[in-house]
Amino acid sequence: MTRELLARAPLENVSLPEIASRSDVARSTVYTIFGSREGLMVALAEDLLERGGFARIGQALRGPDVVRAFEISMDVAMELYSQEEPVSQALLSLAAVDRDASSAAARLNFGRAQGMRRLAERMHEQGVLRDDVTVEEAADILWVITSFETYAQLRRGRNLTPTQVGERLLGMTRRTLYRETGDGRRETGSGK
């Protein structure tokens, strides 16, 4: 019920009494389960991550060829972002004006910065990064490229399909981060 309320009107104050009423349970039941409105919002974020299968992104990133692993992870991310777009967008919009929702939004991004740092280090170790790009710069660029907010801007602002968004983001990554191969092309992963 919380997902539906939030997606329907993201900037409305989604209250525990309304959620309890629409779920046909007592308000005290919601408090017993979640502890607070913030707890409910964080549980919603956890559900979004689990239901969306976001663990698949991490699995993809562990592939031996870092470029190919990143490409696969981006394909997975675009699929998941599109599946969970209404609730993710609503939660992130509400987070700008609601402290309880901001905790939930932070949960959605938990670990992504560190993960992108590790990815940038692997790119450096495998000789993928351009010489003029530091690991720290690469991590920052990857952090922006992999965010839901970046996906949403291209999806809605440029009216692109999820596949097109992924292609644009991978193109940006190649041109910004990857060194040229001996034949003047950019790294593209062993599978391409």
Regions found by a protein language model. Give the residues of each.
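Generic hydrophobic, amphipathic alpha-helix propensity
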Residues: 1-3, 19, 29, 44-48, ...
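Short, flexible, glycine-rich and Lys/Arg-enriched loop motifs at helix boundaries
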Residues: 8, 12, 44-67, 128
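Hydrophobic alpha-helical connector segments
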Residues: 37, 43, 56-83, 109, ...
